UniProtKB/Swiss-Prot annotation:
It comes from the Eukaryota. Residues 1-284 form a coiled coil. This is Tropomyosin. The molecule is in a coiled coil structure that is formed by 2 polypeptide chains. The sequence exhibits a prominent seven-residues periodicity.
Length: 284
């Protein structure tokens, strides 16, 4: 009986232990179930993430391809840009060389300008004139243009007058040569007439000896003498007229030469003034 009780107590204890283990197992099973559900949820989330990752990977691949294409285009543009840079470098080198030449010229110009400035500073009156001309430079330039036009007109008119004077001088030289020829002819004729008069005088002396015998011849000789005298007077008048004409032409030529010289001096002075004015304006 005691054995049965002990056995019953042992079985009861074992039952209680079994119940406790069952409860523990149920709790453990519940935990395992929860862990399983959690794992399944994690797996589902992982699957979702993997799908999204695949989508993202595809998008990344597409983006990568686009970036590769853009990279190729960029490399092409970079190659072209490098070629342009090389061309620009060569151009810059040429420009630098031109700049060196220009700088050298600029230095020379600045040196000349400095010398001109020093020269301008030496003259207070010139400086004031430059200041006045710089204030009214437009009006001065217009005046200079008018003066230049006037100088050009004067020069052209002087050239025309010179040509006209040269033409008149040539005509005068021809007339002078003709007058000299006529004068020489007149002088020769006068010599001939004097010789004839001398001969006539001798003849008159002979006629005086034989006046009665040569009365008619004397009248003829007197007529000849009168004719020769008139011819001599005419020759003298022509010679006088030729000398007067030559003197008149010479005076006219001298007058034209004086006018031409005056015009040239005026043109020279005006050109000098223009050159000086432009030089002062440039130096200023």
């Amino acid at each position: 009986m005691d054995g049965i009780k002990k056995k019953m107590i042992a079985m009861k204890l074992e039952k209680e232990n079994a119940m406790e283990r069952a409860v523990q197992y149920e709790e453990l099973l519940k935990k395992k179930e929860e862990e399983r559900e959690k794992r399944e949820n994690e797996i589902s989330e992982l699957n979702t993430k993997m799908k999204q990752a695949q989508i993202d990977c595809d998008e990344v691949q597409e983006t990568l391809q686009e970036q590769m294409n853009k990279l190729e285009e960029t490399e092409k543009r970079a190659t072209n840009a490098e070629a342009q840079v090389a061309a620009m470098t060569r151009r810059i080198r040429l420009l630098e060389e031109d700049l060196e030449v220009s700088s050298s010229r600029l230095t020379e110009t600045l040196t000349k300008l400095e010398e001109a400035s020093k020269t301008a500073e030496e003259s207070e009156r010139g400086r004031k004139d430059l200041e006045i001309r710089s204030i009214a430079d437009d009006e001065r330039l217009n005046q200079l243009e008018d003066q230049q036009k006037e100088a050009k007109y004067i020069a052209e008119d002087a050239d025309r007058k010179y040509d006209e004077a040269a033409r008149k001088l040539a005509i005068a030289e021809v007339d002078f040569e003709r007058a000299e020829a006529r004068l020489e002819a007149a002088e020769s004729k006068i010599v001939e007439l004097e010789e004839e008069l001398r001969v006539v005088g001798n003849n008159m002396k002979a006629l005086e000896i034989s006046e009665q015998e040569s009365a008619q011849r004397e009248e003829s000789y007197e007529e000849t003498i009168r004719d020769l005298t008139e011819r001599l007077k005419a020759a003298e008048q022509r010679a006088t007229e030729a000398e007067r004409q030559v003197s008149k032409l010479q005076n006219e030529v001298d007058h034209l030469e004086d006018d031409l010289l005056a015009e040239k001096e005026r043109y020279k002075a005006l050109s000098g003034e223009l050159d000086q004015t432009f030089a002062e304006l440039t130096g200023y």
